[in-house]
């Protein structure tokens, strides 16, 4: 992903404030509520019967933290996202059979959750930079599918 110096500063500046557990759990929870068909990949997580059940589910929160921790790793390797996410791409393609469109949807949920948590700090320019990053990560995760 090519980011200008200003975009990199916006991304890294905001990311330094992010609570990975809180934002990750909320972003994954939002994905499962807004796009309920994605729940089929998480049947082992127990009760996903309502928005409250999803958002309060400890397994959703734990996996959301794991997802955002991995995303954070990608922020350290913006010039090599495909390499950084190669193993995860293979896992999601070959073993889990996740529709790669879901990566884009989750990226959008991450952006929405960041906007929700950081409001005025997450202005249009910061959002534009994060949209580039989540698109790059989604593309890297979908790489094995091509």
Curated annotation (Swiss-Prot):
The modification S-nitrosocysteine is found at residue 93. Residues 2-146 form the Globin domain. The modification N-acetylvaline is found at residue 1. GO terms for cellular component: blood microparticle; haptoglobin-hemoglobin complex; hemoglobin complex. Keywords: Acetylation, Heme, Iron, Metal-binding, Oxygen transport, Phosphoprotein, S-nitrosylation, Transport. Heme b binds at residues 63, 92. GO terms for biological process: hydrogen peroxide catabolic process. GO terms for molecular function: haptoglobin binding; heme binding; hemoglobin alpha binding; metal ion binding; organic acid binding; oxygen binding; oxygen carrier activity; peroxidase activity. Red blood cells. The modification Phosphothreonine is found at residue 12. The modification N6-acetyllysine is found at residues 59, 82, 144. The keyword Transport applies. The modification Phosphoserine is found at residue 44. Heterotetramer of two alpha chains and two beta chains. Belongs to the globin family. Involved in oxygen transport from the lung to the various peripheral tissues. This is Hemoglobin subunit beta. It comes from Ctenodactylus gundi (Northern gundi). The gene is HBB.
């Amino acid at each position: 992903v090519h980011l200008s110096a200003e975009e990199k500063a916006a991304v890294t500046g905001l990311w330094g404030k992010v609570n990975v557990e809180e934002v990750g759990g909320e972003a994954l929870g939002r994905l499962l509520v807004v796009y309920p068909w994605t729940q089929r990949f998480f049947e082992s997580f127990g009760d996903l019967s309502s928005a409250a059940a999803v958002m309060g589910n400890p397994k959703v929160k734990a996996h959301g933290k794991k997802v955002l921790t991995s995303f954070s790793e990608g922020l350290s390797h913006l010039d090599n996202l495909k390499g950084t996410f190669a193993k995860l791409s293979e896992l999601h393609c070959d073993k889990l059979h996740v529709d790669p469109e879901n990566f884009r949807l989750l990226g959008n949920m991450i952006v929405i959750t960041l906007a929700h948590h950081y409001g005025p700090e997450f202005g249009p320019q910061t959002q534009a930079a994060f949209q580039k990053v989540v698109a790059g990560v989604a593309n890297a995760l979908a790489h094995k599918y091509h």
